[in-house]
Amino acid sequence: MSNLQHITIKDNRHLLAEAEIQTHPDLVDAHLRVEAGQIPPGARSLLVDAVLDVPNVPPGTRLEITLPTGDPEMLEKIRNRCHDINTRVAGTSCRLQTTFPRG
């Protein structure tokens, strides 16, 4: 059984970034997307924090994230909160594997 969640980061009702998160008993799969154009600093980090703070996911649960290739803010935020990160580039996306951090 899985659970689907949608997270959005907005500024004055304008969408800046969003994530679709599918949780399974032993895996969380998240797809992060950022709108084209100028995004205020910190919006990407807020999205990553929202994904990593999803409730009812035990620490150590496997986490797979798809994010835009070449997004240093998102990648740095994930590296600050998670350990043992593996990444691979797939076209315009980066596929990242790690585990959920401890609260």
Model-based region annotation:
Residues 2-18:
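Conserved beta-hairpin
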Residues 13, 19-27, 89:
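A conserved beta-strand-loop-helix scaffold within acyl/acetyltransferase catalytic domains
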Residues 26, 71, 92-94:
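Short acidic/glycine-enriched loop/turn segments that link adjacent beta-strands
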Residues 26-37:
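Conserved acetyl-CoA binding element of GNAT-fold acetyltransferases
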Residues 55-67:
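Conserved GNAT acetyl-CoA-binding A-motif
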Residues 91-103:
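C-terminal "cap" of GNAT-fold acetyltransferases
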